Curated annotation (Swiss-Prot):
InterPro entries: FA-response_TF_FadR, FadR_C, TF_FadR/GntR_C, Tscrpt_reg_HTH_GntR, WH-like_DNA-bd_sf, WH_DNA-bd_sf. It comes from Klebsiella pneumoniae (strain 342). The gene is fadR. Residues 6-74 form the HTH gntR-type domain. One of its GO terms (cellular component) is cytoplasm. Homodimer. It comes from the Bacteria. Keywords: Activator, Cytoplasm, DNA-binding, Fatty acid metabolism, Lipid metabolism, Repressor, Transcription, Transcription regulation. This is Fatty acid metabolism regulator protein. The keyword Transcription regulation applies.
Amino acid sequence: MVIKAQSPAGFAEEYIIESIWNNRFPPGSILPAERELSELIGVTRTTLREVLQRLARDGWLTIQHGKPTKVNNFWETSGLNILETLARLDHDSVPQLIDNLLSVRTNISTIFIRTAFRQHPDKALAVLDSAREVEDHADAFADLDYNIFRGLAFASGNPIYGLILNGMKGLYTRIGRHYFSSPEARSLALGFYHQLAKVCEGGLHDQVYELVRRYGHDSGEIWHRMQKSLPGDLAMNMR
């Protein structure tokens, strides 16, 4: 196990998470006692206690007063906030993880974009208007794309969609910086934002579904061609 961390707490957190991932502490098992675990990792019990509380909040563990700490099945108990951690733990699975992430984005955005256009068109157009002045480089487009989808999610009037996008932010923007290094990807995105604005202005709500699905398909094709050049550090240094 190779762990890179800058603090005792960071080291302890990575040690426990990687031990859960590698089944040293499998789901359903009980963690070693606090004294034993702190000695095993090489941190103070105070530091360990803080780390365990944080991991419990993220869904990795269940802590109950007077009972041993239990390892959870994190797929069932954690939220989107662990996406970056999963990508870091298993780089070989990053392409599939990203495919799943983009599929979720497409599926839910067909709903919240249509709702935003129908119920709050002025807010939606204000979000889309931000694409007019974007600088032509990957970082700017990665931020723009995330902020447009997030902005439209909140413009729908249902903040839960926005919270879902918040949970995707870290991995989403890292993907975006690689994806939008392609001029073709940047051009496709600008065309998509422009088409969305026209649909919103025209009140053509029923066209949203097909427009978003087509963009998901076309951007997916570009992404799959780029996967061969996926940088090895895409999922690294997430902390």
